Amino acid sequence: MTTAFSPSASSTKTLVEAAVGEEAPLINNSPATLVGLRLNQAIAHSGLCSRKAAARLISEQRVLVNGQQQPHHYLIKTGDFIQVDGKALPEAAPRQCWLYHKPVGIDCNVKSDDPNSIAQLLATLPLRLFPLGRLDKDSSGLLLLSNDGALAHRLMHADQLQQKEYRVEVDKLVTEAQLQQLAAGVSWQLGTMLYQSDPCLVQAENNLLTIVLTQGLNRQIRYMCRAVGLKVLTLHRVRINQLQLTDDVGCCRSLTADEMLLLTSHS
């Protein structure tokens, strides 16, 4: 499925209004995938809302388990029946991963009141997804959206060493010395914090760089370039693992089975 970024009136519904259907009889709605999860995790797993929002619903006494209120850390048991605002918790949506060719100007925060937030796109999709990682507002390229927490951990955890390839335009010709510095790893300081980039693959042609990272430090490439006297003009992510970005700017669609294999081949 492919979708366009066009917010609709229906996106103004609350999460509970949008996701919870008619009242259901008091029967088990906690499949094996929910058993052992904390209550707020189980609600988030259903796709109804985020963990933080689920904890808020619980604290506002809008959640019942088997007809009784429970704390957010309550562990789901086989046979539990969960209700939110008197309605049955919806079944968890199938685990999916989508590709989004993020344009410059879209912020990866999920603030629903920010017109430039990716939240405006997420509200138009047929299921609840969240960004796997982020790209700066001034950057573009391949961004993954998913509802699969296990996949998110595999792709985002620092120990997993996932490759991410970027095409970077800088403000001047790149010297051999600068190229070697970037490849070997550079350091930069923000306030009292000192950061260090790991050795990485870097290629240069005139003022264009190709950089392959396995780290995910905040605004890492911009700080790396600044550390060697270069200013980033454009930054575009073209690959995650073996998954290459070939779609037009703004395209948002679910990955094919073959693309999932490319994405997870090294995870």
Predicted regions and their residues:
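Basic, flexible Lys/Arg- and Gly-enriched helix-loop patches that mediate nucleic-acid binding at interfaces
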Residues: 17, 21, 25-267
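N-terminal acidic, proline/glycine-rich, low-complexity intrinsically disordered segments
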Residues: 1-14
